[in-house]
UniProtKB/Swiss-Prot annotation:
Disease affiliated with this protein: Oocyte/zygote/embryo maturation arrest 10: An autosomal recessive infertility disorder due to abnormal fertilization of mature oocytes, with development of multiple pronuclei or absent pronucleus, and early embryonic arrest.
TM ranges: none
Subunit structure: Part of the MCD recombinosome complex, at least composed of IHO1, REC114 and MEI4. Forms a complex with MEI4; the interaction is required for MEI4 stability. Interacts (via C-terminal domain) with MEI4 (via N-terminal domain). Interacts with IHO1. Interacts with ANKRD31; the interaction is direct.
GO biological process: DNA recombination; meiotic DNA double-strand break formation; oogenesis; spermatogenesis
Top-rank lineage group of the source organism: Eukaryota
Gene symbol of the encoding locus: REC114
GO annotation, cellular component aspect: chromosome
Protein name (record): Meiotic recombination protein REC114
Localization per Swiss-Prot or TrEMBL: Chromosome
Keyword Acetylation: no
Annotated segments matching region Disordered: 157-190
Length: 266
């Protein structure tokens, strides 16, 4: 996963190679005691981290944008600052996502170190923010299942217009948006999107409930992987790979394996 830093927004990608959604805010969970060794900030049955570092989208600090590119890379930018960056390919082993209305909660566990961050989508209206969230969930569903606690199924058309809601019959188990069978979805077709149900009389769900759902299961559904690449797409793809701090180590391992294979042939 890439660390926050200053990076150019121009990745050499065309509009058809990347999907973007505006965010109202991004928040990162900060462990309550930074002097302790890093570890899971949430465990089943315990209270969530008390501190969140919040980034608001504005002209002064920079507008927040969530981007998913054709290579499967996921980014969150504020202006030219990279806040999050990782590949969704194979993320089923360390990533979980929960949706609540127009918000997404992400939980990652890598080498026994866990962290949480969340985003809230923006729009000119509440309906448009929900539509942006639904569209992003459908894109994420190409790689990983998005979980929804005790949800109502909301069917949205990914074209301008208000969403239509229908009640879900199953209220005793967590809902999820399954991964999609293909990467090319037409915006004029209806997309099924899932939102969380009303966990309280005012229709709100606590962060504790979301976190418990996020960390309840060790098993995640199979990720959808796509590998249709043309030679002309290698440049932008390599630029994206170089933004991942783990990529140089991966290249070294590949070189070692290639040398082993070359030695066997000789």
């Amino acid at each position: 996963m890439a660390e926050a830093g200053k990076v150019p927004l121009s990745l050499g990608l065309t509009g058809g190679e990347a999907a973007e959604w505006p965010l109202q805010r991004y928040a990162r969970c900060i462990p309550s005691n930074t002097r302790d060794p890093p570890g899971p900030c949430l465990e089943a049955g315990t209270a969530p981290c008390p501190t969140w570092k919040v980034f608001d989208s504005n002209e002064e600090s920079g507008y927040l944008v969530l981007t998913i590119v054709i290579s499967g890379h996921f980014f969150i930018f504020q202006g030219q600052t990279l806040l999050e960056g990782f590949s969704l390919i194979g993320s089923k082993d360390w990533l979980k996502i929960v949706r609540r209305v127009d918000c997404l909660l992400f939980g990652t566990t890598i080498k026994d170190k866990s962290r949480l961050f969340r985003v809230q989508f923006s729009g000119e209206s509440k309906e448009q923010a929900l539509e942006h969230c639904c569209s992003c969930v459908q894109k994420l569903a190409q790689y990983i299942t998005v979980q929804v606690p005790d949800g109502n199924i909301q069917e949205l058309q990914l074209i301008p217009g208000p969403p239509r809601a229908t009640e879900s019959q199953g209220k005793d188990s967590a809902k999820s948006v399954p991964r999609q069978p293909g990467s090319h979805q037409h915006s004029e077709q209806q997309q099924v999107c899932v939102t969380a149900g009303t966990g309280a009389p005012d229709g709100r769900t606590s962060l504790t409930q979301l976190a418990q759902t996020l960390l309840a299961s060790e098993e995640l559904p199979h990720v959808y992987e796509q590998s249709a690449w043309g030679a002309e797409e290698l440049g932008p793809f390599l630029r994206l790979c170089l933004m991942d701090q783990n990529f140089p180590a991966f290249v070294e391992e590949v070189e070692k394996e290639l040398k082993k294979l070359a030695g066997l042939r000789n």
